[in-house]
Structures are given as structure tokens and as C-alpha cells.
């Protein structure tokens, strides 16, 4: 048996373990509470393992800017003008070498609690992924936990220079930062930054807009953006060296992989330099790139640097439009063809912390309509798949938590708890006692689907064969609302069918002769197909010259194990 297909469970610990149901909009940690690393218990992790997951990606683990006062623990006070929400953005890192204190039961022992969590994760048979945020840091970055003899970012910068390859930041000499318009509290002291630094989303202005990443500052990797984009990589820039040390530090703590935030905003040359060095010392460690520019995909995969890339602008965007009825299901084929032979290197998902929940009013408006997209996402290839916590329960993301507002997303900026996840948590029991029948059924569907993808060798490691081209003229198949394909090895074949229609359908599927020879079944004539997802369905018998007749539920699908007789 080959290595398992990767299934990643993405979760924000601050919300995952929080059982406080106060949920006061813009509430403090004292009012609304916070989940802790200890809530990622052996029971919870074993539940994930049984549900088919191989990895857990914890976001918000590293210390990030927050309005909560931890000065009594020696942690510097943050300034509210440069923080989004009370809890702050997990992507505005204030100390690359520290654990976020919100997640600790004993703040003074927060690193010990993280290391114990890593140990629990590994004992459960799962692997840990954390965020590596290389492009920007919190505006008031100040590492109090950096190792001895490690200089802090910016501590040796020549701030009179707008650009220097030896600086860690970009500066706007003679200009003071102005972000006061974004803060509506009563703080009497204005945040001072002089000279102003460039903002994280490449905004070289002393007065960033509310739409900019104003809570962050851009890191300098030796590219002079205001000087025509000239690159100064020899000698190796100081920022490169600091970032390599940070990656090695967290790898030494037992981290099994890094999801690299906004990787395309950092020079490709840096990744080509740093990843081989980390992998040499920690073989098998994963690097996943958040990337939205398809023209850069292959350069990020060259020389086995990044292991996987986000497939947001390809498969995710197409599946969302197909599920909503904006595009025909046949466009899924074009999404796959657009990445060609690197499709197995793409990380598939239908939810994450940046995107709107499937069941939200901004997407499908119902938890009952997500199965078709998830079947395609999970079964289309050997590549990894990610599930966002609460997705498997049909979480709608329609709370108005505070900074985020009601936008169809689960907040990453506020202290909050998620109703569906909180009831599943059930004070650490992680059971179905407080879940509705629909929530249980959806959770069971996810578990069955993920486990099938690793149990069936055809889905785990098999080749892909698109059946859409053979069914465009098939009057018994709607190529605008159904999608069908084969996955197979020399020993096993699976037929996967998804129905994006709001109605149950009876369809026929034509399988061309070429497909049988493609899977070395040219000597077989008669076949049976056993349904794997829906146990109440009967097996189907067919011959090579026949169309296969199937009944597929609305907004769902089926996986059939095909055997030759």
C-alpha cells in the first residue's frame, strides 16, 4: 500500500476549543473566552484520525498582535490603532519565536503547552502543519522569545534609507505613519511610526487605506520595488537568513509542514534557496504555498521545492460557480486541464479561512448542497484535500462577530465560539449528543468519503480518466449539471459521478472503449458496479457496449467500485 492521500483538517484553536457561548460582538477574551491548545485533546485528535484525516493545520499558533493585555507576563502591550479586531489577525505576527498567549492555560508555560500538543498530535498518528508568514509582520513586531544572539527584525536597519538590501523593512524617510482613522476607541495615545514603513500588501504609503493590510509591514527580501524591481540577492540578504532560522526553529519543535502565507509575494529565489536547506535537515517536511498566480506555479514546484500549491483560482473558483449554477459542470474539465500535469501537486478545498462558508447566504445557503463539490474535490486526483473546521457540520458562518461583520466567513479577528463546533465539542466529549440529525449525517458523509479515498487504491493512487468528452452528445446525461470520471489502477477501478442539480436525477453514462484499454481492462466485457457511499443502493451490471444507468441524489454523488467479470 502506497502512502496515504493527504487530508488536512484546518482549525483555529482560539475558536475550536472555546465552549463559552456568550458571543458578545466585539467582546473581550474575558467576556467571550478563548480555546486553548489543551483542547486539542487526544480524544479530539483520535476522532480526526478515525474520520480519515492525516494532518492538522493549526492557524494562529504563533504570537500575533492582539488588544488583550499580557504585560504582567512580560509581553509588550499592543497599540489598538494597528490591530484588526480584539483578538487580532493570526497573520500579523509580533514574535516569530513565540506561542500566542491566548492559547495557553499557563501563559508562562505556553511553549511547553505547544510542545505537549505536538506530542499528542503525533501520538494520534496525525502530522502538524503551522503557518509560516514570510511576507509581513505586525507593525510593532518585537520578539521577546528569540534565541540568544539572534538580532530582531529591523534592529540594525538604516532607517534613513528607503531601500537597502541589508535592511529588514522598507522605509518612507521623512514621513510619519497615519492610521488613526481606522480606530474608533478612546485611546488617548496615537501610534507613532517614524519613518513610516511600507505596508504588508506592497503599499508604499504613509497613509494606507482601510482596505490595505495596515496592521502589517512588508519585509525586505532584497527587491527594490520603488527602484524598478531590481534584485539584490548577492550577498544573501539578512531577511533570508533570519527566515531560514525561523523555519529551522519550528521544524526542531516537531512541526511536520508549513503552509506559507502569500508565498508569491516573496521572491521565488528565496524559496529555491531556503526550502532545500530545511528539507536537507528535516527530510519529509511539507511546504504548501498560498499562491493565486498560475503563471508562477511551475517555478514554485521546480527542483522539488514546494510540495503543493493552493488550487484556489482553478478548481475552487470553478466548483463554486458550478455549484451555484453560474457555470456548466463541464468547466471542471477545463480547470483540470489548466494545470495539466501538475494537478497532483494542487491542494484542493471547498472552504478555508479566507473563503465564505458553503452553507452561508453568500454561497449555497444550505448545508444540504455541499456533497457534490466535496466528492469531486476529494476524488479527482491523488493530490491533498483540505477541510475547514465546521465545514463537515455545515457551519454557515453567518454570525456577526465584531470586526469581521456578517460576511459568510468565520472570524479570525475576534474572540468567539462557533455554535456547531461548540456543540460537537460538548465540553471536551467530542460526540454527537448535541448535534442535529442533519449535522450528524453530513459529518458521517465526510468521514466515509475521506476514508474511502484512502481505502480504495483507485482513489488513493489511481490514474484519472475524464468521461465528459464521451457524454456531451448523450441525451441521458446533462453535462451542465453532472460530472463523471474514472479513477483506477491495474487492480481496481472506480466510477465517480457528481450531480450539481437541485433534483434527483436518473442518468446514463457512456464509457468509451479507450477507457477500458487505458485501465488494462480491454479483455473484460461484462462489469458490475458496487456503490460505496450509499449502502442502500444496489449493484449495477453492464457490458462494454451498454450505457450505465444510475440514479443520483440532488447535490450529491456516488462512487462505484467497478469489477470486470
Task: Go through each PLM region and give its residues.
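Short, solvent-exposed turn/loop segments enriched in Gly/Ser/Thr/Pro and often Arg
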Residues: 12-15, 57-66, 131-141, 261-267, ...
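Alpha-amylase-like alpha-glycosidases and glucanotransferases acting on alpha-linked glucans and related
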Residues: 3-4, 92-93, 101-118, 143-257, ...
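C-terminal beta-sandwich/jelly-roll accessory domains of carbohydrate-active enzymes
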Residues: 502-565
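Short, polar loop/linker segments at the starts of domains and inter-domain junctions
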Residues: 19-38, 362-367, 538-549
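Residues at alpha-helix caps and immediate loop-helix transition turns in enzyme cores, especially N-
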Residues: 113, 270-271, 507-509
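Loop/helix patches that line or flank the sugar-binding groove of alpha-linked glycan CAZymes
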Residues: 66, 81-82, 340, 352, ...
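Short, flexible loop/turn elements at secondary-structure junctions
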Residues: 13-15, 62, 100-103, 134-136, ...
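N-terminal structural segment of carbohydrate-active enzymes
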Residues: 1-127, 135-138, 142-153, 157-163, ...
Amino acid at each position: 500500500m502506497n502512502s496515504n492521500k493527504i487530508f488536512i483538517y484546518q482549525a483555529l484553536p482560539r475558536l475550536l476549543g472555546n465552549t463559552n457561548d456568550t458571543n458578545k460582538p466585539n467582546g473581550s477574551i474575558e467576556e467571550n473566552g478563548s480555546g486553548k491548545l489543551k483542547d486539542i485533546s487526544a480524544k479530539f485528535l483520535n476522532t480526526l484520525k478515525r474520520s480519515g484525516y492525516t494532518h492538522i493545520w493549526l492557524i494562529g499558533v504563533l504570537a500575533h498582535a492582539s488588544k488583550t493585555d499580557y504585560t504582567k507576563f512580560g509581553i509588550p502591550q499592543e497599540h489598538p490603532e494597528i490591530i484588526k479586531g480584539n483578538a487580532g489577525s493570526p497573520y500579523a505576527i509580533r514574535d516569530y519565536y513565540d506561542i500566542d498567549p491566548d492559547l495557553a492555560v499557563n501563559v508562562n508555560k505556553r511553549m511547553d503547552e505547544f510542545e505537549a500538543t505536538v506530542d499528542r498530535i503525533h501520538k494520534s498518528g496525525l502530522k502538524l502543519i503551522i503557518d509560516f508568514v514570510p511576507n509581513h509582520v505586525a507593525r510593532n513586531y518585537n520578539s521577546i522569545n528569540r534565541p540568544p544572539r539572534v538580532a530582531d527584525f529591523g534592529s540594525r536597519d538604516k532607517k534613513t534609507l528607503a531601500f537597502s538590501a541589508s535592511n529588514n523593512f522598507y522605509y518612507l524617510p521623512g514621513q510619519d505613519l497615519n492610521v488613526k482613522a481606522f480606530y474608533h476607541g478612546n485611546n488617548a495615545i496615537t501610534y507613532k511610526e517614524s519613518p513610516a514603513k511600507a505596508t504588508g500588501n506592497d503599499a508604499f504609503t504613509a497613509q494606507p487605506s482601510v482596505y490595505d493590510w495596515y496592521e502589517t509591514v512588508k519585509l525586505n527580501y532584497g527587491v527594490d520595488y520603488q527602484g524598478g524591481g531590481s534584485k539584490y540577492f548577492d550577498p544573501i540578504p539578512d531577511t533570508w537568513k533570519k527566515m531560514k532560522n525561523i523555519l529551522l526553529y519550528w521544524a526542531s519543535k516537531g512541526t511536520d509542514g508549513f503552509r506559507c502565507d502569500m508565498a508569491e509575494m516573496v521572491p521565488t529565489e528565496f524559496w529555491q534557496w531556503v526550502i532545500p536547506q530545511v528539507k536537507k535537515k528535516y527530510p519529509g517536511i511539507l511546504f504548501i504555498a498560498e499562491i493565486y498566480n498560475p503563471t508562477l506555479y511551475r517555478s514554485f514546484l521546480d527542483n522539488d521545492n514546494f510540495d503543493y500549491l493552493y488550487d484556489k483560482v482553478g478548481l475552487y473558483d470553478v466548483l463554486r460557480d458550478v455549484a451555484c449554477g453560474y457555470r456548466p459542470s463541464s468547466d471542471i474539465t477545463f480547470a483540470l486541464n489548466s494545470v495539466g500535469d501538475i494537478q497532483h501537486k494542487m491542494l484542493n478545498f471547498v472552504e478555508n479561512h479566507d473563503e465564505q462558508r458553503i452553507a452561508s447566504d453568500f454561497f449555497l445557503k444550505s448545508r444540504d448542497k455541499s456533497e457534490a463539490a466535496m466528492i469531486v474535490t476529494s476524488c479527482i486526483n491523488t493530490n491533498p484535500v483540505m477541510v475547514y473546521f465546521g465545514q463537515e457540520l455545515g457551519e454557515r458562518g453567518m454570525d456577526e462577530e465584531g470586526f469581521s461583520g456578517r460576511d459568510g466567513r468565520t472570524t479570525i479577528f475576534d474572540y468567539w465560539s462557533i455554535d456547531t463546533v461548540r456543540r460537537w465539542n460538548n465540553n471536551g466529549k467530542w460526540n454527537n449528543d448535541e448535534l442535529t440529525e442533519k449535522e450528524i449525517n453530513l459529518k458521517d458523509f465526510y468521514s466515509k468519503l475521506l476514508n474511502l479515498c484512502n481505502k480504495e487504491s483507485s482513489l488513493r493512487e489511481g490514474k484519472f480518466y475524464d468521461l465528459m468528452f464521451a457524454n456531451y452528445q448523450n441525451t441521458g446525461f446533462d453535462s451542465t449539471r453532472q460530472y463523471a470520471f474514472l479513477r483506477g489502477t491495474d487492480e481496481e477501478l472506480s466510477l465517480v459521478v457528481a450531480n450539481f442539480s437541485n433534483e434527483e436525477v436518473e442518468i446514463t453514462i457512456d464509457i468509451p472503449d479507450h477507457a477500458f484499454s487505458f485501465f488494462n481492462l480491454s479483455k473484460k466485457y461484462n462489469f458490475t458496479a458496487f456503490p460505496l457511499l450509499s449502502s442502500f443502493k444496489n449493484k449495477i451490471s453492464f457490458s462494454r457496449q451498454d450505457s450505465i444507468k444510475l440514479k443520483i441524489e440532488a447535490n450529491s454523488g456516488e462512487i462505484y467500485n467497478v469489477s470486470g467479470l
